[in-house]
Each structure stands twice: as C-alpha cells, then as structure tokens.
Design a protein with these regions (language model features):
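Conserved short "hinge" loops at termini or chain/domain junctions
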Residues: 1-66, 104-127
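Charged, low-complexity interaction regions
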Residues: 16-19, 88-92
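Generic structural signal for hydrophobic core residues of well-folded globular domains
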Residues: 35-38, 84-89
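Structural motif
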Residues: 66-75
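Short, hydrophobic/amphipathic alpha-helical patches that form generic packing surfaces
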Residues: 75-87
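A generic structural signal for well-ordered alpha-helical surface patches
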Residues: 79, 100-103
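Short conserved catalytic/interaction loops centered on acidic-Pro-aromatic/His motifs
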Residues: 90-100
Length: 127
C-alpha cells in the first residue's frame, strides 16, 4: 500500500475529519518506525529495508511512497489512521473498534513474520 492509498481510504471512512494532512502523514511515519522496531528489525531479511514512511520522511513523504507492511496485512494502516482520528476527535467508541481491528492485524502480521523469516541472531520475539 502507498501513502496516498492509505490516506485516501482513511479519508473515505472519516470524511472531513479536520485532521491535517501533515499530521496524518506524521502518524504513518511514526507507525512505520514503531513496526520496524517491534517486528521487522527481528527478521533476518533486507526485503523491507527501503520501504516505509519512516525511511521516506527525510526526502518529503509523497503519495507514491510505499509503506512498510506488505499485503494482505496493509489494511492495518487504514484502521490505525481511523483510530488516531477518532481518538483526536474524542470518539472513544469508534476508536476502540478501530484499535481492536488494528491490534488483530498486528498479531497476524507478527505470526506471519515469525513463520516466514528467520529471526536475527540475538533477537527475541515477544508477541
């Protein structure tokens, strides 16, 4: 999924949310940095080294920049953006639902990474 696709899908679900584009881009950067640290850094592969909003941020995040998480788990970006939007606007019930969906996809992603890639030496999975 690209930055533009994630932002567009989240905007469809939360139209007119009053959250600036720059803030939503910052959320994507923070999320990719967190996911890289918690999940992808433990995998002994270089496949994901150049993807992610955290890596593209220095050059200015563009709509066509590829996000870190591959299909079919990339739907987590939309749930994350919606959850952050709901939290920022005080929509706690909507936030809880979106966050639960995000957490479920994260758990599936962690399992897939453990099964698909060897663990780097001196790294431990804690999920």
């Amino acid at each position: 999924m690209t930055v533009g696709q994630a932002l567009e899908r989240a905007e469809e679900l939360r139209p007119g949310s009053r959250i600036s584009l720059r803030t939503r881009q910052q959320w994507l950067r923070e999320l990719d940095g967190l996911l890289r640290l918690r999940f992808f850094a433990r995998c002994d592969t270089k496949e994901f080294d150049h993807a992610g909003a955290d890596r593209a941020w220095a050059e200015g995040l563009q709509d066509q920049d590829r996000l870190l998480v591959p299909e079919p788990f990339d739907g987590l970006y939309v749930h994350y953006l919606c959850a952050r939007t709901d939290a920022a606007l005080g929509e706690t019930d909507r936030y809880a639902g979106e966050q639960a969906q995000y957490n479920g996809i994260c758990a599936e992603l962690a399992g897939w990474l453990r099964r698909s890639y060897p663990v780097r030496r001196a790294a431990q999975w804690r999920w």
